[in-house]
Structures are given as C-alpha cells and as structure tokens.
Amino acid sequence: DYEVVDSTYESCCGLIADFAKTLGLKVNDNAAKALYTGLVTDSGRFLYDSVSSRTHNIAAFLLERNFDRNAIYRNLYVEDLKSVKRKLSFMERIKFTYNNVAYVYSTKEDVAKMGLSPFSVSRGMVNTMANLKGVHVWANFTEDGDKVLCELRSDSYDINRIAKKYGGGGHLKASGATLGDRNEAEKMLKDLDKLVEESI
C-alpha cells in the first residue's frame, strides 16, 4: 500500500484531481462533480489561506466537464427556515474566553433539542462561528455518548498543535479531537486562550 501526503494542497480532492490532470487520466462528469464539490467545501468556497493559483487551475480543469456548478452551491449552502432557526439557537449559546476565543458546548440534551446527530452538530455547526468580528479562534464541543467531539477552527493561528496535544489532528487552521469529558474541553479552551494571548 502507498500513502500520498502533500499538505500544500487545500484538499484531498484537489490532490486527486491534480494527479488526474497531470497524468492525463480521463475524468468523467460525475467524478468531476464530486471532486469539485470537495474542492469547494475544503477550500471554504476558495476563501482559505491554502487556496492558490493551483487550486483555481484544478477547478478550471474540473469545470471543463459537464455538471451543474450552481446546483452544487444550492445543495451545500441554501437552507430551509428550520435549519436557519437551528443555527440561530446554536449561535445564541456562543461564549467567549478572556482573549476572545469563541466556543459552544453542546450537551446531549442540546443535541437532542436540535434534532441532529452529534457528528452533524460538531462538524455542521462549527463554522457558524466563523466571520465574527474580533474572533480568530473558535471551538465547538459536542457531547457524544461518554466522549466530547471537538472541532477547532482559526483564521490566523496554528490550532493543529493544540488538537495534537489532545490526541487529535487535522490541518493548520482546521483540526479536531475526541475528548474524554467536559473538564478536558475546559483545559483545551485554556490552551486555546493562551495561544491567542501569546500572539497578541
């Protein structure tokens, strides 16, 4: 078995599509649609720092195939009223550390009220805290059985090293971990707060 790791790519889909492009492999419409979808989501709609001219060249290569790009965006980002209300109730629970790390801690009861799986709350809600003015690190803690799922994001700091400290990992500015309990989540919050404090 072989493993290909190249952290300079914004996404695995970008890496795969670039392989296909470079090697002259045939990419059918369905494959192009799937790869383009991964490129869009993992690049934050082409907004993250990892996006480069290579990203856009790969996107252009995929867009030469026949699929509905607008349908992808509609499926990913257009929401019904129930979903918007769910996000509003989530956002009402946002709290802040001393150094402005935004976070939400969702108990099992909170998850049940939202009518979503713990994974959907954890991964699906974390970016509702993105783009808050003055916030450069945000964390989403979600109870799942006897564990706590944690998603970390930042627009400025290397939060991956904090995730690794707690047995997790990911990317420089988008990482996660599975924690033992709420106390461990609070310890992680202190580490995130210290990370921001040391950079001020």
Which role fits each region the language model picked out?
Residues D1-I58:
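Short alpha-helices
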Residues S43-I200:
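Hydrophobic helix-and-loop "lid/oligomerization" segment in the mid-to-C-terminal part
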